[in-house]
């Protein structure tokens, strides 16, 4: 491994106010590193410090700079003196955009903006958060996926899925053609679950909240792998320091497909009465197809019927020495954090 001791320069984390970003900050601070993170506006800085302190990390080793992925200002200051950059920030649409480029262009250009700044200021390695969305959305029927698989953004896919594939491809192309000595490693998790550190919920954690509150009495038969947010954070740290990680992408997940109904059963069996409102039934494929005529959410689910993706995580285990938590632990810890922070409406 690199000689990266806590006394060396700061590690830059983009998007430290986000769900994954806050866990990456926490993991770095707990490991004794000095950390610099970016926020889009100054009013987010205090919340980032408060979250770090609440998680038990030392916010005194945390520096915050303002830099927006949509503008050049601030990035030279952000990367100055850093050997490593963990590029975690990426746009996630709160609603369906009017045009797919509203999501695709900011994701691609933001990644390139970070990479250019890193190259120009002598950063050794960038670890970029991509997604399984960039890996496994162009095959029907599921099956086993590894790092050689790629999603084709020319397919009929959601803007978010396309954005992950386009941004990651652009990052690899830039590094090969213009990166100079800059190294790139990429982390590709599926849906990220696990405990929240503050009251701002990701879409995936919001799904668990909805299950606990009874907002989803039934769920479609959708299958997917799960990554624990703490495991994804650790994968970033290991990819940052492991020499063999340079030039590689890593699938991060349990390696076993679960389903929405399977998650509901984990909640019911693990929490008893506290999960009394969890989904009690899984829709049949026929019900999904019928509902897809009028329900946009079911329309997307209908396109996934019969798809059971399995992620091969052998490379992450072998190269990074990484091991995932179980789905049960991840789901129950997600719920536990929601109850602890008072985020579940009775």
Residue spans for each PLM region:
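N-terminal Rossmann NAD(P)H-binding glycine-rich loop of SDR-like oxidoreductase domains
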Residues: 3, 9-33, 38
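Mid/C-terminal beta-alpha module of Rossmann-like enzyme folds, strongest
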Residues: 5, 235-300, 318, 332-346
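NAD(P)H-binding glycine-rich loop region in Rossmannoid oxidoreductase-like domains
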Residues: 42-43, 47, 53-109
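Conserved Rossmann-fold NAD(P)-dependent oxidoreductase catalytic core, especially the SDR/UDP-sugar
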Residues: 87, 91, 96-160
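A conserved pocket-lining segment of Rossmann-fold NAD(P)-dependent short-chain dehydrogenase/reductase
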Residues: 96-97, 152-156, 198-199, 206-231
């Amino acid at each position: 491994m690199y000689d990266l001791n806590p006394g060396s320069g700061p590690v830059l984390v983009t998007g430290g106010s986000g769900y994954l970003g806050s866990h990456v900050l926490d993991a770095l601070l707990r490991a004794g590193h000095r950390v610099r993170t970016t926020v889009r506006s100054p009013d987010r800085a205090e919340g980032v410090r408060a979250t770090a302190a609440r998680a038990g990390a030392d916010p005194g080793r945390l520096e915050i700079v303002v830099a927006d992925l949509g503008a050049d200002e601030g990035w030279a200051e952000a990367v100055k003196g850093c050997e490593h950059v963990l590029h975690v920030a990426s746009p996630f649409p709160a609603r369906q955009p009017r045009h797919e480029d509203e999501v695709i262009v900011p994701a691609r250009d933001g990644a390139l903006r970070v990479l250019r700044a890193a190259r120009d200021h002598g950063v050794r390695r960038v670890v970029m958060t991509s997604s399984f969305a960039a890996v496994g959305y162009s095959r029907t029927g599921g099956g086993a996926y590894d790092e050689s698989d790629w999603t084709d953004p020319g397919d009929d896919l959601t803007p978010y899925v396309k954005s992950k594939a386009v941004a990651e491809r652009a990052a690899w192309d830039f590094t090969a053609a213009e990166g100079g000595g800059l190294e790139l490693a990429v982390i590709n998790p599926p849906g990220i679950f696990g405990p929240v550190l503050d009251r701002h919920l990701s879409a995936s954690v919001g799904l668990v909240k909805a299950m606990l509150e009874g907002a989803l009495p039934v769920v479609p038969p959708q299958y997917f792998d799960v990554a624990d947010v703490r495991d994804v954070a650790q994968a970033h740290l290991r990819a940052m320091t492991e020499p063999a990680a340079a030039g590689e992408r890593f699938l991060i997940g349990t390696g076993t497909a679960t389903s929405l109904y399977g998650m509901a059963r984990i909640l019911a069996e693990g929490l008893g009465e506290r999960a009394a409102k969890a989904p009690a039934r899984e829709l049949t494929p026929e019900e999904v197809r019928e509902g897809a005529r009028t329900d946009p959410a079911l329309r997307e689910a209908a396109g996934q019927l019969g798809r059971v993706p399995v992620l091969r995580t052998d490379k992450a285990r072998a190269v990074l020495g990484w091991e995932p938590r179980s789905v049960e632990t991840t789901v129950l810890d997600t719920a536990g954090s929601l109850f602890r922070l008072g985020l579940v409406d009775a």
